[in-house]
Structure formats: C-alpha cells, structure tokens
Regions:
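Accessory terminal helices/loops
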Residues: 18-34, 148-152, 161-170, 174, ...
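Metallo-beta-lactamase
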Residues: 74-75, 81-83, 141-210, 255-267, ...
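Feature captures hydrophobic
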Residues: 389, 395-401, 405-408, 412-568
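Conserved beta-strand hairpin/beta-sheet module of binuclear metal-dependent hydrolase folds
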Residues: 40-97, 220-223, 227-232
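Sec-dependent signal peptide recognition
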Residues: 1-7
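Active-site metal-binding motif and surrounding structural segment of the metallo-beta-lactamase
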Residues: 40, 46, 50, 72-73, ...
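C-terminal motif of bacterial Sec signal peptides marking the signal peptidase cleavage site
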Residues: 12-14
C-alpha cells in the first residue's frame, strides 16, 4: 500500500491469529445466543407463492439474498455482502432457475446487501438493472469515503471480523461478515425513486416503497401477485438496532414505526426479511408487526416521558424495560439492538449530546480527571492496586473504567494491558448480545502485540468505476493536516480527460473543493478519473503514474507529491 493512499480499508487485525493465546471461557449467559445460530443454518429455501416461485438464501453471510422467478428472467433482492458470497448463493439459485438476472434491488445502502452486485455483472452479457432509493448511493459513498477508517474499524469489532473462528458465535442477524473475501462489488443504482415505484420486470409486478427505519434510504418490496413482502432491515428476529454501536446517523424511530405500520397494511402472507428466516401466514405476520412496532413505540414514548421529567440518559436507560408480554417475544430478544442503547440514542436524537447536567457541559479533560482520581486513590500505585482488586473480584466494568484512567496517565504498561484484557474478555464472554460480545472480545484481541494494520476490503477497477470522484475529493478535505502546510493560499487544479474539472484550494487551515474551472493554479494535474482513483486508493504509486505519463503535472512533479503527502 503506497504512502500517498488516502482511502484505504484498514482495521486492526492479526497476521497470525493461530499463534495468539486467546482463551474465552464458556458461560451460561450465551446459551441462548448459541441456540440462535440455528436461525442461520445455510440453505436455499424455495416457496411456491400464489404469484410464482421465490428462492430464499440464508446463512451465507450476514444478509439474506432473495431470487424471484420471472417469465424470462429473475430478480435478485439484496446482492449479499461480497462477490464471494454472491457466487456461492447464485450457484444454488441457478440450479433452481438458470434464466438471466434482469434486475437487482437494493433494500438499502449497507454493504452486506450491496457489495456482491458486481458478481452478477461479471457472469452474464446482459447488464441487470440496479434499483434502489435515490439516497442509497449517497450513503454508500459516505461510508466508503469520509467515514471509512472509523466505521471500518468499529464494524470489524462489532461483527467480530478478526476473532478466532471458534469464538465467533454469530453476529445476531447472520452468521458472519464475509466482505474481506473478495473485492468490493458495489454497483451504482441506475434506476432510483423517491417515495414509491411500481414497475413490471419479466412479468413480475413489483411495488417499491420508501420506508425509513434502520436506514434513511430503506425501502420495502411488495409483490402483490405473490402476496409477499420483503421488509429489508426494518424487521428481523431480534430486538431492532435502533442504535448501532459501530456508529451511524440518528435513526428516526417514529419513522420506523410508521414504516412498520405501512408494511402491516398490506397484510402479506409471506414475509421475507433480509436477516433471519421467512415467516409464513397472514395472522402470524400481522401479530409480529404489531409486537415489533409496539415495542419500538414503547421505548420511544417512555424515553420521551422520562426526558421531560428531567432524567439523564444513563438514568433512563436503567429505568426502562419492555413489558413482559413484549420482551418474551422471540422477535425482541436482544441479539442485535438493546433497550439500553436505544434509549440513549433517542435522547441524543431529540436533544443532542448535552444531557442537561451543568457538570458535564465542559467537564475536566480525561487526563486531568484521571490525575484527580489517582490522587483520591492515594497515587498511581494505589490506583493500579485498585485495578488488580477489581479484576480479582470480577468487578470488570469498574476495572475497565479504572484502566481508562491509567491509560490517560500514560501508565498503560504490560500489567495494566493484561488486566484490561482480562476485563474485556470477561465482560464479552458473559454477554448474550453478539454486538457487545464481539466488540469486547475484539478489543481484547487488539491488545496482543502481534496485531498490525492490514486491509479489510479488497478493491479493483470495477469498484473504482462505481466510486464517485467527488467521494475521493471529500476524503481529501477531511484528511488535510493543516500543521503540515505553511498556511499560504495554494491551489491545485485537476483537469480530467472526461472534461470534468475539480480544484483544491488550501487556505485558513481547510481544503476547499470546487467543481468549477479556476485561474492562477499553483499546480495543474491532467489525468483520467480512474488513474487518480488508483493513486488515491493505493492501487498505484503516483511516481509510476507520473513516469508513464498517465498523470501529467504542470508546476512540478515533486511539488505534487509533497501536496499529496499532507493528506493523512
């Protein structure tokens, strides 16, 4: 990977996991989670619906993939998390029906639903239509662009991507994430819509509806003749992820409820979720919709009630529990989202990060607070003794908090690291919520000295052709290190062979991006979009691109390399 790359898919992972000592105790708390893995037994199930055959692939990656048979072609709903999984799934789909794929429908932007699409373009001459909500590509570009480093790292922890295989039970809504097993296969949609779209493809009547919920671009698919509904990620057999610990924009809980009510109004006889198994039967599906939406409304309404009573989010999260008649539903076991995290997210969504406590508006810095806690404990040595005592007593959450103070004091020695690792393993091992379990165990594994940075996701030109050049310029903006620039106005202009122009002006500590032609450029760069993408993603060394003439710099090749080096 070249040092000039600004878009890389990096996480902490191990080059030799098998050489690491990592023992996780078996606890009774995870028995339900182990049983939950039965939900993801790998298979393709065929359903003879009133409108025709629907094939349902489950257990290959996190998300399910669905194939609907048409008259002279088939439709894929959600394309799996990788070309690797898409190939395995389609080998089985093709045995059911070998007609070409006429269309791929993305229910939303998440990679486990979109990153396998390119496989279908690779295997047939006919290019399938890619259908999605009009905002789907925006969210894909955002995640793989400016937020890529932190979302990639936190997602890898949450999904247990680099845990030893024997320690990954499941990820709550699927068996595992396989995104690293092949180059990213995202393909931009070429047919989008805002609120609803009714279309007939290969004789199949399809109705698509915008249904904000787990994502803002979420849609659901209604096949009226099949009496079948595909809800995407708005319902699955676990408590909904009203907030995800990998990080996300605020999820509109009231919009999610409204979307569930809309789906319920169709009275489907077949429900094919994008995670967990299908549900058959109008009455059962109707009851599940009621239970699910009522649980979400309960959490929302009670959070608002207690917010208005003056409680803080951490207090509210301890006060609210689902009524027993709701919490006993298998669709509301906390195998993905939790009530506690949801409460805090709802509070933040309405009131923002400040909880209302004046002591927490401008608190002491982490380091200053750690110094004072250390002083209260009797000094740094006494603080370490308290950490040892907490671990001995298996008071592990307190141990984690104590180790935070020691880290802030730059006292993260081998003993503190070992004690923190024990606390993380203990807390993770006893959690029946896979998001928490995987995040804690992954964080513990990262503390091994053998860990180093490596790529999670492979990329190639197919991916780059679907990556907007503006995504890369936006990444440059947020990777600019002003301390590495002298502060003077400096303008670099890019002229692409397609006729597209972009410029970056460095001024006042920011990198200002423009899509208009500029005068008085310090550097002018002439190239193709794909070539700059290769350089900025590390597929090519800019020195070789300049030497070959694929990048021409007016104003100095060395100056251009220096310019690239200030984006980190």
């Amino acid at each position: 990977m070249y040092k000039y790359a600004i878009l890389t898919f990096l996480i902490l992972t191990s080059c030799s996991k098998e050489n690491l000592e990592f023992k996780v105790p078996t606890t009774s708390e995870v028995e339900k989670l182990i049983k939950h893995s039965d939900e993801f037994n790998q298979e393709v199930i065929t359903f003879d619906t009133p409108g025709g055959k629907i094939h349902f692939a489950i257990g290959f990656g996190i998300a399910n993939s669905i194939m609907v048979e048409g008259q002279d072609g088939n439709i894929i709903i959600d394309a799996a998390d990788s070309r690797y999984d898409a190939e395995k799934i389609y080998e089985l789909f093709r045995k059911k029906n070998s007609n070409p794929v006429k269309a791929i429908i993305y229910t939303h932007n998440h990679g486990d639903h979109t990153f396998g699409a390119a496989y279908y373009l690779d295997i047939q001459d006919y290019k399938p239509q890619i259908i999605a909500h009009e905002d789907t590509d925006y969210y894909v570009q955002r995640i793989i662009g400016i937020l890529n480093p932190i979302i990639t790292q936190r997602s890898a922890r949450m999904f247990g991507t680099f845990l030893p295989e024997e320690e990954l039970i499941n990820v709550g809504i699927g068996p595992r994430l396989n995104v690293s097993k092949s180059p990213n296969g995202y393909v931009k949609p070429d047919l989008t819509f805002s609120d609803e779209l009714k279309i007939t493809i290969s004789g199949i009547e399809i109705e698509l509806y915008h249904a904000p919920g787990e994502t803002n671009d979420q849609i659901f698919v209604w096949l009226p003749k099949h009496k079948s509904l595909m809800p995407g990620d708005n319902i699955y057999k676990t408590f909904p992820n009203l907030y995800t610990i990998r990080g996300t924009t605020h999820r509109d809980v009231t919009g999610w409820i409204e979307s569930l009510d809309l789906m319920k109004s169709f009275y489907p006889e077949y429900l094919f979720p994008s995670h967990t198994r299908p549900v058959i039967g109008k009455n059962e599906i109707n009851n599940i919709f009621i239970t699910y939406r009522d649980a979400i409304q309960y959490i929302h309404d009670q959070t608002i009630r207690l917010m208005n009573a003056g409680y803080y989010p951490d207090e509210i999260s301890e006060m609210i529990e689902l009524p027993q008649n709701l919490s006993s539903s298998p669709f509301l076991y906390e195998f993905y989202g939790t009530v506690r995290w949801s409460v805090k997210s709802i509070f933040n969504g309405y009131l923002g990060w400040f909880n209302g406590n004046p002591a927490e508006l401008d608190p002491l810095s982490r380091k200053e607070k750690a110094k004072r806690i250390s002083k209260l404990a009797g000094g740094e040595n006494e603080l370490i003794k308290e950490l040892r005592l907490a671990v001995d007593k298996e008071d592990m959450q307190w141990a984690l908090e104590l180790s935070d103070y020691l880290i802030s004091l730059d006292l993260f020695n081998s003993e503190v690291k070992t004690l923190r690792q024990k606390a993380l393993i203990h807390e993770g091992a006893k959690s029946s919520n896979p998001n928490k379990r995987n995040y804690f165990l992954s964080s513990a594994l990262e503390l091994n000295d053998e860990f180093e940075l490596t790529n999670l996701m492979n990329i190639d030109d197919t991916f780059l052709n679907n990556l907007s050049i503006d995504t890369l310029f936006n990444v440059l903006s947020v990777r600019f290190k002003p301390e590495d620039h002298d502060g003077s106005l400096y303008k670099v202009c890019f002229n692409f062979s397609s006729g597209l122009v972009r410029s970056i002006s460095l001024r006042n500590g920011v990198a200002v991006i423009s899509n208009e032609a500029q005068n008085n450029c310090d550097l002018e760069v002439l190239t193709q979009e794909i070539e700059l993408k290769r350089v900025l993603t590390g597929l090519k060394n800019p020195v070789s691109s300049i030497s070959s003439g694929e990048i021409v710099v007016q104003g100095g090749n060395t100056e251009f390399l220096k310019f690239l080096a200030i984006f980190r």
